[in-house]
């Protein structure tokens, strides 16, 4: 069954233009890292944002994930906040419903992901933390209740990103949680320039936040859903092992084209991990063989965020990993069968990212021309970077890389992304229902940003409602003229964040879609639609 939810007035080609609208839309949020002056490592690594339709009314709502109270902090306690989207007219209105929704998570929040874990038709939340993680179960009444302890996913270690996916294709959502290091406020160390030590006065400006190699990495966790929304730790039995790396980003998707979900983890100063799904929830470690574990010189980089999308238009899913300053961001182009080629230099992504420390990353068709562009959120971890001998400034401009076709990019400096802060998590969704993707950026201990996409062009938006299974992991293929585009629905990506579950396609000036194929996760039959008008929002039910 196909439902047409509406259309917007966009037509013709598009020149990229964004406008910052956080106050105008009622999305004022300032991240609070709980800074005490003691330079606790966790202070500089948060926070994330989740864009998801928690109330099932057809538009995406916004969850900002805040920090928490650390020893020595004396301000107001930080608090994660949920904003309900009351879209309508040219200017949407967001309402803070944190209290009404029963979101009383009071841990030190890092990131999150949203998915229907118990199969009741609404989206639940998983929030990662420095401390116990929490699963917030959506009651379907506009309220949530805590279920992390009950469902056995309340990992007490320092977790970063998380992602939902049906890793065994049994119809329910499993959960992968990325853990970072064993840092705590009790094993806190003095870190500064080479040769400095704790005898140096902090007031001399010599102290910085510690890098991850000062601590031990912590093993990630894979939780298998039992079909009722309860979870079992399946990390070891699935073949993932118990290796302890300093992980930050994760995506779940089909990396080798065999229809089984695979896992990719961005690690900080450790080799990135690629686990190939071989069936029934089992994995094989293909990290080294894949070509996506190191840079082209065989060096492990400081991976932060990760995106998985078809960036060169060949139908295969490519990887982008954001890295530390002087490393450049990585573009691993899929060569098929789970093999990747490092094409960051020929793609034009390396040199412009050399001086930046990048975190969030999102693939979106910003100009609606039919190929995917890239947004990258930048910001250093050291407020005194120059003083302690590190490259770059603390506040850094974010970047939009326009896709010139076939996976080659150029930086656009004139698109309205003018605010310079210290960015971390980022996500995209059509928040005002006008057919293009808007952006939300969380800045460390600073106000967040919301950018309305003002680009004009034709488009198609596809939402899914699949009876008996989640839409997460579905593949949607669109043919318009001689161009074929592919999207996968994903619950968790970028850095500590999640973007919309609705698939968006830019059509340029095209007025019709010749063919749309939806391939649900697992063995279900594909859904085929033909001759669709452009600039429509479709909700496909089965």
Name every feature range the model reports, one short phrase each.
Residues 27-48, 76, 101-113, 150-163, ...:
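Repeat-based blade/solenoid architectures
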Residues 11-17, 25, 35-36, 348-351, ...:
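Gly/Ser/Thr/Pro-enriched helix-cap/hinge segments flanking short amphipathic alpha-helices
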Residues 18-21, 92-102, 143-152, 229-241, ...:
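Blade-edge beta-strand/turn elements of extracellular beta-propeller
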Residues 38, 46-56, 84, 108-119, ...:
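Beta-propeller blade termini
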